[in-house]
Regions:
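Bacterial N-terminal signal peptides that target proteins for export
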Residues: 1-3
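C-terminal motif of bacterial Sec signal peptides marking the signal peptidase cleavage site
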Residues: 13-16
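Bacterial signal peptide processing site
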Residues: 18-20
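Immediate post-signal-peptide N-terminus of mature secreted/exported proteins
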Residues: 22-74, 143-147, 173
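Heptad-repeat coiled-coil alpha-helices
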Residues: 52-55, 59-63, 122, 126-129, ...
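Long, amphipathic, charge-rich alpha-helical segments that form helical bundles/coiled-coils
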Residues: 77-136, 143-146
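Extended amphipathic alpha-helical interaction segments
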Residues: 120, 143-173
Length: 173
């Protein structure tokens, strides 16, 4: 029995060491490095666009003003924040560093975000014109719509981050 136990004890270290050389580093090609660089560049451009495009402070100021039916101190001119057209073109056309499904999801979410943002600020302008006409009923309807649009904008932003996060984490490795 002692010989059997001794043989088993000797066999385990040999079996566990014979699995091959685990010190080899994974082979990374130039294409992988270029792809990772494209992902990081796209992500950084996205961060800039998202930060500049939908400023939570401005959205909340518009909603607060609308909530008070224009009785709050007049807002300084609120205009949609400017976004560099080159950057918006980049985020709407993600490169081949992403698979087709991811590219489609990014395009859909950015398109939805751009549309919601445009409608949000257009509604605010219309809201102000309704207030001048003392048309409180239609103004109230726009407040409800803008609350929905602000929620949509937040959801689109979160979706974009959720889509990009796994790719950027992988690219940073």
């Amino acid at each position: 029995n002692l010989l059997l136990v001794g043989a088993l004890v000797s066999a385990f270290p040999l079996a566990s060491c014979s699995g091959g050389d685990k010190s080899k580093a994974p082979v990374v090609s130039t294409a992988d490095i270029e792809n990772a660089a494209e992902v990081i560049k796209y992500y950084n451009t996205s961060l800039g666009v998202l930060k500049d495009m939908v400023k939570e402070k401005d959205v909340n100021a518009v909603l607060d003003y609308m909530e008070q039916k224009g009785k709050a101190p007049a807002l300084s001119a609120i205009v949609p924040p400017a976004v560099v057209s080159k950057d918006s073109a980049i985020v709407l056309n993600p490169g081949n560093c992403f698979n087709e499904e991811t590219r489609q999801n990014l395009k859909q979410n950015y398109t939805g975000l751009f549309q919601a943002r445009t409608e949000f600020y257009a509604n605010f302008d219309t809201y102000l014109s309704y207030l001048k006409k003392k048309d409180v009923t239609n103004a109230k309807k726009l407040l409800d719509v803008n609350y929905q649009l602000s929620t949509q904008m937040s959801e689109y932003k979160q979706n974009i981050f959720d889509i990009l996060s796994p790719f950027t984490e992988q690219a940073e490795l």
